[in-house]
């Protein structure tokens, strides 16, 4: 299997046209799967500078040095990395008054210099504004997150058009919160409207909400859940691998039980 990360690519921007579709959840889970299933060194960054909650979703409630600090001051980007118990390296965001102070070209240069990471995931701000453009400019390729409803699919077209304008490839679409109801937009219709391949369909799974409450990735908290399996397969796809059956995740989660 050929993976996504080739020809020097290692920075994936996870983007969407609107909030609440599951970008942060996707970043955390495919990152955690890569770090633990495939023993990859993974860095996840919150580039949603005005309302990011990547750190909060992992229980990082206090982070004096954030992405904004390293872009504003001449600090090494590694100074802001939080080493999480899941094996993920995390750079959270903080509220800033003016996103124009962030130089996405400089950010990409800094990220490219981190040769010790196999995969870098950017949790983007939603929409097509200046804050959302940070991830697009810094990424090598993009994952577009949608939910199977017409308003979300319609607005996703704007994100695709922006990516084309900025000459950033969109690897494919992740359909999140799938319930397989008659009122949902079908996979075939989403592919037709957006003109992009569907690389994953993630079910609307109770395990995601339980894991979020525990401040843990679902792939570790509930490894056998349907959504967790979808995220593990997506992570495997990134590296051109297959998900192997076994007890690794079952054993690993015991280390996090309270």
Sequence positions of predicted segments:
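C-terminal lobe/tail of nucleotide-utilizing enzymes
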Residues: 2-4, 165-258
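Walker A/P-loop phosphate-binding motif and the immediately C-terminal alpha-helix
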Residues: 4-47
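Short, well-ordered alpha-helices that flank and scaffold nucleotide-derived cofactor binding pockets
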Residues: 28, 32-36, 137, 158-161, ...
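Solvent-exposed alpha-helical segments within well-ordered globular domains of core cellular machineries
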Residues: 32, 68-69, 79, 105, ...
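Short, conserved catalytic or interaction motifs in soluble domains
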Residues: 36, 47, 93, 141, ...
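Conserved catalytic-core segment of NTP-binding enzymes
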Residues: 43, 109, 114-115, 119, ...
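P-loop/Walker-type NTP enzyme "switch/lid" segment
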Residues: 44-115, 212-214
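Residue-level signature of catalytic and energy-coupling elements of molecular machines
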Residues: 46, 70, 91, 123, ...
